[in-house]
């Protein structure tokens, strides 16, 4: 899980320009990290590229926090 978390954290920091310390498993992309809907779509696309997977629109809608993203990635690998 640490590897996925580190990789997800790097993508979030790069994409949203937030401090790495703010990227916790409980952090919500929109409420805590200031992402808008377009940011979330772009994050999902970057996660797909980084982890070489496809995330369905239905699954993407369920990914609201950093922990959701990490858990989803770990469940698919």
UniProtKB/Swiss-Prot annotation:
Belongs to the acyl carrier protein (ACP) family. It is found in: Cytoplasm. Carrier of the growing fatty acid chain in fatty acid biosynthesis. Gene3D superfamilies: ACP-like. Disulfide bonds: none annotated. GO terms for molecular function: acyl binding; acyl carrier activity. SUPFAM superfamilies: ACP-like. The modification O-(pantetheine 4'-phosphoryl)serine is found at residue 37. Pathway: Lipid metabolism; fatty acid biosynthesis. It comes from the Bacteria. HAMAP family: Acyl_carrier. Residues 2-77 form the Carrier domain. 4'-phosphopantetheine is transferred from CoA to a specific serine of apo-ACP by AcpS. This modification is essential for activity because fatty acids are bound in thioester linkage to the sulfhydryl of the prosthetic group. One of its GO terms (cellular component) is membrane. Keywords: Cytoplasm, Fatty acid biosynthesis, Fatty acid metabolism, Lipid biosynthesis, Lipid metabolism, Phosphopantetheine, Phosphoprotein. This is Acyl carrier protein.
